[in-house]
């Protein structure tokens, strides 16, 4: 609806308490760094409890966002789908980050439809 990439993310405490949420606003803000995960991370403010946090995201995090998870030692990542884009979650898993891929059909369809209709914008988002 806003004309951007339909990916959202949220940062939670392990007990389920929402810390912050965000979405990909790269197009809306003309800023290539505003991916969903980075938006949620920034909105969460300064913290010292990242190992006890969970990042939940529509799609497997790209390398940029995977680096953020690694840099700040976020303890777990829950991924809506990894079929349309695999991202860096295998690397994060190898480093000890708990990874859960839900394989949610709604997320898969949402992204597949978006990619089919906006291939140039999508390729720009993932660095192609």
Model-predicted segments: where are they?
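Secretory/periplasmic and organellar redox-cofactor proteins
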Residues: 107-128
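Short, basic/aromatic recognition patches
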Residues: 1-4
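Zn2+-dependent cytidine deaminase-like catalytic core
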Residues: 13, 20-112
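Short beta-strand scaffold segments in enzyme catalytic cores
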Residues: 7-16
